[in-house]
Amino acid sequence: MEPILAPNPNRFVIFPIQYHDIWNMYKKAEASFWTVEEVDISKDINDWNKLTPDEKYFIKHVLAFFAASDGIVNENLAERFCTEVQITEARCFYGFQMAIENIHSEMYSLLIDTYVKDSNEKNYLFNAIETMPCVKKKADWAQKWIHDSAGYGERLIAFAAVEGIFFSGSFASIFWLKKRGLMPGLTFSNELISRDEGLHCDFACLMFKHLLHPPSEETVRFIITNAVSIEQEFLTVALPVKLIGMNCEMMKTYIEFVADRLISELGFKKIYNVTNPFDFMENISLEGKTNFFEKRVGEYQKMGVMSQEDNHFSLDVDF
């Protein structure tokens, strides 16, 4: 039995802190709380009306995937991780993660509601798990892992792949729109959400390091490469990024680059050994690393939650 999963009679009381690294992650999550009301999407409609039909199609489908996926992540947290993990510090993090995933889902739903006026099309997008085969494939993979009989360690990797790999290409595609100066509300919310998901991914890596009997490197590689191929197909075949003027081969490479960052953070050898083909993603990740806890708006932080000495925190995964 893993210590973090062993019955813990002290789980109802937070102090004394036993796992300081996990507690620090919780405090970082707490410091970065935000709400949809902080994002101004009023200026997006002008840009939206100027987009080509292909660009609109792409954005709507990406938002439809995102709107559903946060709910799947939360179902896993509620049904599995929150009941399995017995240490208080991790339960604090998971509880906070559930709250912020709800905010992500609300944000994506609000964006769809703002951009799409036709009620039938809205329903189609809000029910993407049933209505869109390309979204259903990713959702099915994630849902399969909620109910899988595999141990906590394997499922931890699978959901790190969901948040670290399944979201990566879509985040990059929205940052591409930012590079073009389009859709300030969408791109600002994307910054906030990608930052949150980076922290969730880092937390999964931290929990993995607390396992005494983690899954084998072979198992980890299998799960990650599986997620990579599904994400590559999603953004180069089902919903090709060429619709918004991005290069599909570069997107494939970018997803491999992200997967290498994740598997390295888990303590294993890289699989693909590729460099980041998107210079604009390098700049964004560096910005986030240097300013993460210095500004409230854009690089948000609740005042006074974190002390000054914690300002050096950097995201190990690119979002």
Swiss-Prot record:
Cross-referenced InterPro entries: Ferritin-like_SF, RNR-like, RNR_small, RNR_small_AS, RNR_small_fam
Origin: domain of life: Viruses
SUPFAM superfamilies hit by this protein: Ferritin-like
GO molecular function per UniProt: metal ion binding; ribonucleoside-diphosphate reductase activity, thioredoxin disulfide as acceptor
Keyword Hydrolase: no
EC number: 1.17.4.1
Top EC class of this enzyme: oxidoreductase
Cofactor: Fe cation
Span list, region Interaction with R1: 313-319
GO biological process, one term: deoxyribonucleotide biosynthetic process
PROSITE patterns, sorted: RIBORED_SMALL
Catalyzed reactions: a 2'-deoxyribonucleoside 5'-diphosphate + [thioredoxin]-disulfide + H2O = a ribonucleoside 5'-diphosphate + [thioredoxin]-dithiol
Keyword Iron: yes
Cofactor binding notes: Binds 2 iron ions per subunit.
Entry keyword set: Deoxyribonucleotide synthesis, Early protein, Iron, Metal-binding, Oxidoreductase
Role noted for this protein: Ribonucleoside-diphosphate reductase holoenzyme provides the precursors necessary for viral DNA synthesis. Allows virus growth in non-dividing cells. Catalyzes the biosynthesis of deoxyribonucleotides from the corresponding ribonucleotides.
Summary of subunit composition and partner proteins: Interacts with RNR1/OPG080 subunit. Can interact with host RNR1 supunit.
Entry similarity comment: Belongs to the ribonucleoside diphosphate reductase small chain family.
The name this protein goes by in its record: Ribonucleoside-diphosphate reductase small chain
Gene: OPG048
